[in-house]
Amino acid sequence: MSYIRSVKGREILDSRGNPTVEVELITDQNVMVKASVPSGASTGENEALELRDGDLNYYFGKGVLKAIANINGPIAQILVGEQVYDQERLDRMLIEADGTDNKGHFGANAILGVSLALARAGALTANLPLYRYIGGVHAHLLPCPMMNIINGGAHADNSLDFQEFMIRPVGASTLREAVRWGAEIFHTLKGILKKAGHVTAVGDEGGFAPNLSSNEEALELILLAIEKAGYQPGKQVVLAMDCAASEFYDKTTKQYFEKKKKQKNQVFAERTAEEQIAYLETLCQNYPIDSIEDALAEGDWCGWQRLTERLGRKIQIVGDDIFVTNPKFLEKGIELGVGNAILVKINQIGTLTETLQTIRLAQTNNYACIISHRSGETEDSIIADISVAANTGQIKTGSLSRSDRIAKYNRLLAIEAELESTALYQDSNRFQIF
């Protein structure tokens, strides 16, 4: 047996220079682990509460000292002396002690940091890789990456309202090959943008953030980069998008409008839900797109039903803001026939136990799962282990730049090397568009 000797929280910075939570846990066997917590920019209304201090004179209100105090006080009192292997029981104890639906008392950022540290301590004490400790002997599936190489929306200061334009190296035979393809396409795209006179600065998730005239221009540039790098669009490499539609949805008029173009006094489109669905359908007809995330606003359940009816047998319809990694909302989606895939973000729900519960619910009901980073990340690579542990087959962890993104790819490469001949690289998206 191994017991928790101490739990300490501290305030560190994320990839955007904002405060976040790091937890250090030490066992009675002197095993010491750390875990840190990410933060999102475009967030769902029903996400677990990220506790911030609100003191405008300290990090402009974004400090997390309240969450740290909760870790060092009541949370530590609950956990010290408990067995490190009791992940689910301890997660449930923290949820019960918090006593709120959204973890608003302790803060989801406090609870999650502790939950992840518990898993790391258990794995290290058991002398197992983290993915094996969480997933057992059947954890061997390396995920196909969604690589966000052009950023827009809340992740970049440009005129694109769609938030992410991604490539998926579905034709690669190994994760190592997939990462190489992605890196080569990324660097090729940089050359294309530079030659065209575009800025090659990157956004929050490491993708380029040029000022482009339309979503179509972004897709065309990516296709050109794929071809110029020597790969076949639609066969070896396909496209994916995250619209993050809640960010440009007007609840009063129930219209989707190009908000960023409007703010820059440019000509902008305005669409009803039906028009938005038709527009996306046209994009899928014209480009090798096999996955679209958050195509409509999170509260537009009827629109999501129509979207799934129209496109759900052709491509992957991914719910992020509408499901927020919460089994309650996923169950509603399953009942209503909304989407066919879920984006899984550990800080949306706030514990490892609930994250795995949501993944099991999705997989049982034939929903694909994509493990995801957040736009405000740290060097912590735990989502790589979780993706392999749960055999999700897909991961979204940014572009091929910025160390906070590359850390996850490098961890996956290490896992693949460790698994050797038992490693399987296979995309879990069941839709083949070629």
From Swiss-Prot:
Keywords: Cytoplasm, Glycolysis, Lyase, Magnesium, Metal-binding, Secreted. The keyword Magnesium applies. GO terms for molecular function: magnesium ion binding; phosphopyruvate hydratase activity. (2R)-2-phosphoglycerate binds at residues 163, 345, 374-375, 396. InterPro entries: Enolase, Enolase-like_C_sf, Enolase-like_N, Enolase_C, Enolase_CS, Enolase_N. GO terms for biological process: glycolytic process. It comes from the Bacteria. It catalyses: (2R)-2-phosphoglycerate = phosphoenolpyruvate + H2O. Binds a second Mg(2+) ion via substrate during catalysis. GO terms for cellular component: cell surface; extracellular region; phosphopyruvate hydratase complex. Its EC number is 4.2.1.11. SMART domains: Enolase_C, Enolase_N. Pfam families: Enolase_C (PF00113), Enolase_N (PF03952). Belongs to the enolase family. This is Enolase. It comes from Protochlamydia amoebophila (strain UWE25). The lineage of its organism: Bacteria, Pseudomonadati, Chlamydiota, Chlamydiia, Parachlamydiales.
